[in-house]
Amino acid sequence: MSLQGPVSVDLLAKEIPAVRDLAYFGLMQTRLYGRDVMISRTGYTGERGYEIFCRGKDATHLWDSILGAGKDMGVRPVQFSTLDMLRIESYLLFYPGDNSETFPFDDEPCGDTLWEL
């Protein structure tokens, strides 16, 4: 599951203080709400975020625990299209869905060219 946004580190740090020092693209194996997890400091939203990998049998417990602990911080579930909008706003493009499959300067003389999104 993915925990993205400006309060993600504060929420996780309540249970795992060392998460504050996790480098971008870093991984750590630890325990979260009493369950074994692997946490990566990754995401595709342009915000600080984490992805939490767990056993299937632990997913519901972790989901409920994260939402409960984060309720007063504004943490709430969102659908994938919300994450997709953040990704596009941060110019993290998904090829070829967000841009052309052709190079915009093919067969064009030097000069003003508008990039497409």
Predicted regions and their residues:
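Conserved, structured C-terminal
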Residues: M1-L117
